[in-house]
A protein has these predicted regions:
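Amphipathic, hydrophobic secondary-structure cores in small proteins
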Residues: 2-5, 9-54
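Residue-level preference for short coil/turn positions at secondary-structure junctions
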Residues: 1-2, 62
Length: 84
């Protein structure tokens, strides 16, 4: 399992993803954004899953960025624009 961190453009994205993850029975945590990262809404979601599975949880227009987590290191995998 790999841990991924999702940042969102707003708290609406956090709430939508949390509900979807709960419904799927996924292992996740909602936390404050780490200090070394910047985010609009102040909250993020840590998701533990097999590499590749994180892609299905990207919410177009809601997800701002996706990171792979290794200890205190965050590797940026992708950034996404807000929905117009």
């Amino acid at each position: 399992m790999t841990t991924f961190l999702f940042l969102f453009h707003s708290t609406v994205g956090v709430v939508r993803m949390r509900k979807a993850l709960q419904a799927a029975g996924a292992s996740f945590r909602v936390k404050d954004i780490p200090r070394q990262l910047r985010g609009v809404c102040g909250l993020c979601i840590y998701l533990s899953c097999e590499p590749g599975e994180e892609q299905k949880w990207i919410l177009p227009g809601q997800t701002a960025a996706l990171f792979r987590v290794a200890g205190d290191d965050y590797q940026l995998l992708a950034q996404f624009p807000p929905q117009a």
